[in-house]
Amino acid sequence: MTDTSFIESEERQALRKAVASWVANYGHEYYLDKARKHEHTSELWAEAGKLGFLGVNLPEEYGGGGAGMYELSLVMEEMAAAGSALLLMVVSPAINGTIIAKFGTDDQKKRWLPGIADGSLTMAFAITEPDAGSNSHKITTTARRDGSDWIIKGQKVFISGIDQAQAVLVVGRSEEAKTGKLRPALFVVPTDAPGFSYTPIEMELVSPERQFQVFLDDVRLPADALVGAEDAAIAQLFAGLNPERIMGAASAVGMGRFALGRAVDYVKTRKVWSTPIGAHQGLAHPLAQCHIEVELAKLMTQKAATLYDHGDDFGAAEAANMAKYAAAEASSRAVDQAVQSMGGNGLTKEYGVAAMMTSARLARIAPISREMVLNFVAQTSLGLPRSY
């Protein structure tokens, strides 16, 4: 029997082709124009939802496509490869959609998933705090009972696209009744709830999706705002973080493909002497090396998505972290080499590559830093002792 595990099915190939064909109508110029005008990519988002791309991973009974993380990461990669990588793709359908689909009540699924799937509703995700980045055990946002209600108080930072969201999935800590200890808990908070506010963080990123500080000042929520069980929030949280890493890797792979495409088109035609500069090994070899690295990262991303969709949570966690690391490194080098290959033109607005430099660099920091990935691999894959 022929092993076809590295060959995408006809359905996946058709999806990839459909996304690439559609998103080409928008592209990098659209993305940059929206970013520089401080406007949202509303048309792109709405059409992605209408075509079924946003909810491809969500259950069919709630308006989704009934596929998996592989298909959603494929959509993300092709959008990024066209120069239109959207952070909210990582957040709304991948993290939040996954968590609610797996652990939400029937009412929560009916309320939130159809809108997430068709793009009419966007849900942000809030975990990071000023003093709690990589160490989620230091989260200080608290949720206390008041009758049947919950009262949420705390502050979050570097929250993507909150100004576009109708709700946000907040990671807080609730008090265990027997011991009094604080434990993680997940809550869906409407962004128009009294006591909920946010302010933008000025970033050196050319992106239509902005970053925000979020303040929860005694936000009152009904009992059904709690997602899943109070005593199982860690497992619920990590059910969303593996998709986050897979989607981050897919985005980085797409960015690397885009940068290489622009560079290759340039060096094929640019002449300094008698031949195109792409004929010279000083340019050809670095670009070839970048292409190899991006393709390797893509394979690891596909492996991670496949393991996740098959329910292998441990295997998916290892592969997702490796994919995120490999893709971030590959895309950063690809963007840098693209700029170098194009010389001064690589830094102009006309070619649109330099604007990706901070976005590619971001992939090495978020959603998890390269150092924390290396810690995970050292400790989990290699069995080395922890330093913290």
UniProtKB/Swiss-Prot annotation:
Domain of life of the native organism: Bacteria
Catalytic activity: a 2,3-saturated acyl-CoA + A = a 2,3-dehydroacyl-CoA + AH2
Cofactor(s) for this UniProt protein: FAD
EC number(s) given by UniProt: 1.3.99.-
Pfam family, one: Acyl-CoA_dh_1
GO CC term, one of those recorded: plasma membrane
Functional summary from the UniProt entry: Has acyl-CoA dehydrogenase activity on a number of substrates. N-octanoyl-CoA is the best tested, but n-lauroyl-CoA, n-palmitoyl-CoA and isovaleryl-CoA were also used.
The organism of origin for this protein: Mycobacterium tuberculosis (strain ATCC 25618 / H37Rv)
Keyword NAD: no
Class of the enzyme per the UniProt entry, highest EC level: oxidoreductase
Protein name per UniProt: Acyl-CoA dehydrogenase FadE12
